[in-house]
């Protein structure tokens, strides 16, 4: 069904104002059908009108036509004879060709003229074309191409179509459609590339210019009543047409449809019916469309309609909606009535844009508007101004160039008409059709009344109407057609007494008849005779006669003027005509005289005389009547005195009338005012009732009417308070809900990690104990029996019993009786009676004494927070606040540093110092103490002073909120069961204390992502001033000045006795940090002082630090424990995006490890390295067992450590299923993890060789950077100062200390810790000082081979590698990372290689890297390499292959709880994918098939995966194919990264060299796969790195989120986002063999989470992937060329693809 059209819209935006009406032809006869006799050449300014009855064509100059009204001159026209009467004329699109179709002797011909030839004397057609072979066929439509002016299509009346391409020299090319096609109409497309044709039945077809069919649109059967034809069509836009359907038969009205034919989908029809209101006759139905695309208008002209329809579209798009417009009555195009009051119809219609005149409406001048010309069926040419008064209307007019008339044949149009009249002998038969073409012939747009004066100057049209007799002799100007104005004829300028005659085209009813034209042709008014104008005029065909004045006219009429009224807005111009007496010839131009001569005066003179006589008679009669009427009136008046009485009475009546009016008016006003007040009252009452209805509770309190304004105001205020309170309450509720949800999450996680003891466990245990007791008693009893037997004593006793049994039958009877009466309770009682009360009591006592053993992991009890450490932390926070008030000079330095952006190579990171949190403590990952042999333990019992980091809510960084102090037993740090699961163990990590901070623990920072909460370092007796926050310029801060040659030692300026002034501000200030992404905030050297700027991603002072590590403020204590105030360059480590874990002192060495050696250096940007973290090592002889004060309970996600009661050194029990301390920060992605705790927990540092430093006050002024075996947290201080060469001197040990640290102490990593985003500082557990070789200060690195050195790479910064013997320069957070000796994997994967930091300058190539990067040390990442050969629950065991790192998703290597047995080193089983071969549980892994060879999903023989074919894994052969990573893209060759360097990973570059490619979404992929660690040997540009300038040893694979690692050393540095071994630093997850075996989960880097994989072949713990191919879930998904399906998942290998950015992650690599 067709849709109904929208309703009509009344508008005044578009108006048609009649400009001029002239007679173009006379005697047009009956209206002809199927003709179009009007065409315009807008480019030449010519209008062509074909005669409906004569073989002629009139060419009219449009400019003259427009000016005719104002100049009172006839438009210039030329009469061009044609071979026969024209049927259809049309102008080409460029206006240069005119096609005329005419039928000559029955043959239809098409004559095409050059338009310019009409201005020359000789007019000849350029082309003469015969349209059809048969006769009596004419053209129905001439369709010129709108773009190609030489292309013309002709629709013929027999249904054929001819297409002509006109060539030079009169030639043409033709294509045609046969008449069998029955073409009814056509239209070109707006661009002229196709033509659309209408066919019977509503079919519409699109053809190309060569008439090849392009598209067919069939009309559905239910659109229009069949049968019907398509009689007109207009192509509006690409997919939209206007069509007119006409049903066959009589009395059928046409209907206009808008046809929407979208490219896809069925066409739709919208029915507008007939907007022209056509009649059914007198002609055949024919419609002409005129589309004005600039104004989105469509004009529709009907052959049988008296009105032009107009439609508008206001929408954009392919198929906009159209709406019919209804214009004002005076602004429409309506065909005028003929003289006989018959309807006239359009014979032609032309839209003309050649106009140049401008109209003024309401004193506002409009822009040039186009015109519309209509030729009516009675020969009149109507010209309308087409006004668009919208302010946004675009101009469509363009003035034509002037055309010179060289023909000499253009004459005033009225002369052409006169010559026609001569040819007509019977001209008198229709006098009314011979308009006298006087200059003021027809003025139709005058809005004025007739002027009552005879004047030759413009007369305004506002004069009063002439009095009854004043019109004599005055020329009446004509009023507009619709108006009836006294003395005027609407369509022609009437002639008053002596005025020249005018044409009477549309009669109006005259008022009194004076000076008006007759209403009817016959005597219609008092003085008119047969249509002639009243008083002396008669319709003449001779222009000259028109100016004759009858002699009988009134004397004043001798010089009449005929004013021609201007357009509506112009003043009325009266153009004077100079008349002379009748007998003299009028002084007119030559042409009129010629006309006079052509007429015979003898013929006309008598007629004129007769008519004048008649008029005079009539006039005299009329005067006589008037006189008589006057006399009759005078008779009633007696005397003049009577008049006075009448006058007085009239005055009285007038006054009375006025008074009555006033009174009535006042009454009305009062009544209205009262009514208005009542209405207001009613409205107010309604409002009140509505309010009461809406809020019924108010009515209980008060009557709404009783509220006075003040009460209302108060009520409104109270309501606003209520609303505000409600809003706050809602917010509070939301907050509480959020916290509750988080709490529930924690509870769920804790409950998962906790063993729930069945409720009957106690009973069971007691029963078993009793059973054991009874069995023991039985054994004793049996012993006694056996001894009795031996001695023969038992036999006699038994015999006695036998005798007693064989008693008399009486006994048997009693027995039966007792059986009958026996009850169970008696038996029980009798049995109980066997035990005396004393015995029962003893049993009870024994049972009660034996306590039920509840075996469960314990966690520190947080309830009450009464730990001294916490109270101390609070006190420090208060002190810091007080201290914050005093600006330290250091702050000034930092501020200065902040301003200049550091040079690109240094890395755009603002100078490190500036950050308020400048002291981002790189919490050195204190390796979890391993049981170590205490050597020379002098003060075994010295507890390390707990560093008290504040708790960070949800911190991804390493903040260790509560350092738990643990007493140190020199050798083993056993976790006592009680210690184990205390309240907040979260399954993934430590208890959460707090609210979600991604960054260092801002103590109370809500959701801070990075601020490092300052971990207050353990009090150290003589803190090194290096952390001189107060002393901004400690010597160490200017390390550059020292010549490398002079001393490779940093002299720590360290007053021994002076307590280090580690500002304690940081803690307090970080507490109120709000969500900052990079704890850059550091003002001054305050350790943790984070500015409170809300949520900045790294800008200075940004609170939302993604990685600020909590600054560990070393607590200075007098005691001689080694104090390490490691000065970390202020902004260094902490900026891990998920910042590094706090330093956690390692328990392992007898050497005191100072916990959190973070030197906060607020050095100016220029300092190459902030002073080395000089640990004032004076009293190095530390108790051999320093308990790591920050022994963080490892938590999968957090390295946050909590205050934990002393942990005995036994490190073997993993407290948490996923390990990692997270004891305090709920869900922190970065803190260090207590290795001992946790499935994924960091492994404790491999026993570091105990080195005892014997000198108590050994001041090592020149702190040689020998990595002492002290497992002091090597706080490698990275200075982000522009200097490219920061040498970080890490733990300075008294020189005397032996540096035999072999400890591969894994830095505690948390399973998910992301190493500091920006800081790549990680102190390897063994203090492996990284000395920058290139720095002038190259500190010697002693031989300590701390294998376990974890360098934590920072997400954005180079990995901070603590290279033991490597003299790799330490990179500042933003500088390129030094090569970390160990490749550390990051959850998002760091590239194990020296790389420039994302943001920073290149580090110089490490000079001494001892080993080429061996792929041996696959970095461990969350999902990457597992620890060495300890079975780990999730990691596959490694049997042998050194390099393979198994992955949670990836290849297995040694039997694991879940999984596949270790196989060849390459194969790693995947949790989800093919596992390796046989596993403890059968060869299939819980989640995946145990596949012997495939990395992540190679389908091993028979292994099946729970999820079907490795749902997430691609099966890959054991070949070193790519190790995929969830987020990683294959490594392989470096790929360009969107942000910069090469990797195509979105943020980073893939690592290139490693055979196994593991890409990371955030960083270059490398073989290691977890979330992104990747190893690579060749530099790949880092996403954030290369882009921002990386430079250093030329190789830097920067990773977006993963810190790059240098694979060269075998040591691994963990550091996901935060340098600390966050995720996997060896100690954290990997190092100490928590689960037995060396490493927690496996290799030493066991769940080395992010930290490096252990050099040994170990399945990559949670992190790094190993070389072997391991496809990764998402990577393989994305890598599939064929798209995702569960079928392909397992089948496709890691097609080696360099997948585009986002590292082949899923979603088809974002192809």
From Swiss-Prot:
GO terms for molecular function: nuclear localization sequence binding; structural constituent of nuclear pore. Residues 886-905, 1012-1081, 1251-1270, 1533-1552, 1557-1614, 1688-1711 are annotated as: Disordered. The gene is Nup214. Residues 472-1703 are annotated as: 45 X 2 AA repeats of F-G. Sequence repeats lie at residues 472-473, 486-487, 497-498, 511-512, 514-515, 535-536, 588-589, 598-599, 1009-1010, 1075-1076, 1077-1078, 1097-1098, 1106-1107, 1135-1136, 1218-1219, 1229-1230, 1240-1241, 1356-1357, 1388-1389, 1399-1400, 1434-1435, 1449-1450, 1458-1459, 1472-1473, 1481-1482, 1487-1488, 1507-1508, 1512-1513, 1539-1540, 1547-1548, 1562-1563, 1571-1572, 1584-1585, 1588-1589, 1601-1602, 1617-1618, 1623-1624, 1629-1630, 1635-1636, 1641-1642, 1647-1648, 1650-1651, 1662-1663, 1686-1687, 1702-1703. Residues 1596-1614 have a biased composition (Low complexity). SUPFAM superfamilies: Nucleoporin domain. Residues 1044-1711 are annotated as: Interaction with emb. Keywords: Membrane, mRNA transport, Nuclear pore complex, Nucleus, Protein transport, Repeat, Translocation, Transport. This is Nuclear pore complex protein Nup214. Residues 650-672 are annotated as: Leucine-zipper 1. Gene3D superfamilies: YVTN repeat-like/Quinoprotein amine dehydrogenase. GO terms for cellular component: nuclear envelope; nuclear membrane; nuclear pore. Residues 1251-1261, 1688-1698 have a biased composition (Polar residues). One of its GO terms (biological process) is positive regulation of RNA export from nucleus. Part of the nuclear pore complex. Serves as a docking site in the receptor-mediated import of substrates across the nuclear pore complex including emb, RanGAP and phosphorylated Mad. Protects mbo/Nup88 from proteasomal degradation at the nuclear pore. Together with mbo/Nup88, sequesters emb in the cytoplasm and thereby attenuates nuclear export signal (NES)-mediated nuclear export. Together with mbo/Nup88, required for the nuclear import of the Rel family transcription factors dorsal (dl) and Dorsal-related immunity factor (Dif) and the activation of an immune response. It is found in: Nucleus, Nuclear pore complex; Nucleus membrane. Contains FG repeats. FG repeats are interaction sites for karyopherins (importins, exportins) and form probably an affinity gradient, guiding the transport proteins unidirectionally with their cargo through the NPC. FG repeat regions are highly flexible and lack ordered secondary structure. The overall conservation of FG repeats regarding exact sequence, spacing, and repeat unit length is limited. FG-rich region is required for emb localization to the nuclear pore complex. Component of the nuclear pore complex. Interacts with mbo/Nup88 and (via C-terminus) with emb to attenuate emb-mediated protein export. The keyword Nucleus applies. InterPro entries: Nucleoporin, Nup159/Nup146_N, WD40/YVTN_repeat-like_dom_sf. It comes from the Eukaryota. Pfam families: Beta-prop_NUP159_NUP214 (PF16755). Residues 1560-1572, 1582-1595 have a biased composition (Gly residues). It comes from Drosophila melanogaster (Fruit fly). Residues 767-788 are annotated as: Leucine-zipper 2. It is a peripheral membrane protein. Residues 1037-1051, 1058-1072 have a biased composition (Basic and acidic residues).
